[in-house]
Swiss-Prot record:
It holds the Pfam family Proteasome. Its main location: cytoplasm. This is Proteasome subunit alpha. The formation of the proteasomal ATPase ARC-20S proteasome complex, likely via the docking of the C-termini of ARC into the intersubunit pockets in the alpha-rings, may trigger opening of the gate for substrate entry. Interconversion between the open-gate and close-gate conformations leads to a dynamic regulation of the 20S proteasome proteolysis activity. GO terms for molecular function: threonine-type endopeptidase activity. One of its GO terms (biological process) is modification-dependent protein catabolic process. It comes from Rhodococcus erythropolis (strain PR4 / NBRC 100887).
Length: 254
């Protein structure tokens, strides 16, 4: 008599975790960090149509890595959740924590109850109301519904270790926008494989066409989300000589 296949609950959870982690690691990296005037999103993303970074609500932003169709479903659901809560109660009742908790509950349920987990990792960013001194807040939500709040930066997707190391070495809380962009791009360039025809010792170069950049700007009175592209972004990118040492001082010359 053939015995039925059996796997322990622990083994099933380990297999699901491994599947999700591998799917996330195959994607390109995203860096989210706080800077002097709000929150900066920098994603390695050559697509102009399929965004990894998005607005959720007035003072809330969203970034994700992994399978696009899965995190796009989450993004849309988050926007609907925020709109319904703001319409039913008050716009001030729509907070990053409430959205992060909703995402965590959804991902946790999918991870434990569905045959396949979502291969995604997301970040919900929030800045204070216009004119307030409330610090920005970052919430990281992983594939299994785990949630963590961060005060400085979040790195997701791809090869994160060298990117995290570069960020820890040079990050400062009071960076201006240009310095923050250069720091994030310089860190991203340390993450991925070397381009074809180059040695591993040669750093990668990410230009405007390979980046998706946006901010939550606390100086904007209502809708704080703004994309940065084209010549405005090109002026902020680090020069090849500067990529080896990202600026450690927000006021350092380029």
């Amino acid at each position: 008599m053939t015995m039925p296949y059996y796997a322990s609950a622990e083994q099933i959870m380990r297999d699901r975790s491994e599947l999700a982690r591998k799917g996330i690691a195959r994607g390109r990296s995203v860096v989210v960090l706080t800077y002097r005037d709000g929150v900066l999103f920098v994603a390695e993303n050559p697509s102009r149509a399929l965004h990894k970074v998005s607005e959720l609500y007035d003072r809330l932003g969203f970034a994700a890595v992994g399978k696009y169709n899965e995190f796009e479903n989450l993004r849309r659901a988050g926007i609907v959740h925020a709109d319904m809560r703001g319409y039913s109660y008050d716009r001030r009742d729509v907070t990053g924590r409430s959205l992060a908790n909703a995402y965590a509950q959804t991902l946790g349920t999918i991870f434990t109850e569905q045959p396949k987990p979502y291969e995604v990792e997301i970040c919900v960013a929030e800045i204070g109301r216009f004119g307030s001194s409330t610090p920005a807040q970052l919430y990281r939500i992983t594939y299994d519904g785990s949630i963590a709040d961060e005060q400085e930066f979040v790195v997701m997707g791809g090869t994160t270790e060298p990117i995290v190391t570069a960020m820890r070495e040079s990050y400062q809380r009071d960076l201006d926008l240009e310095s923050a962009v250069r720091l994030a791009v310089g860190a991203l360039q340390k993450g991925g494989p070397a381009p074809a025809g180059t040695t591993e010792a040669e750093p990668r170069t990410l230009d405007v066409s390979a980046l998706e950049v946006a901010v939550l700007d606390s100086n904007r009175p209502r809708r704080a989300f703004k994309r940065i592209a084209g010549s405005a972004l090109e002026e902020m990118l680090p020069t090849p000589a500067a990529t080896e040492d990202a600026p450690a001082n927000g006021d350092a010359p380029s």
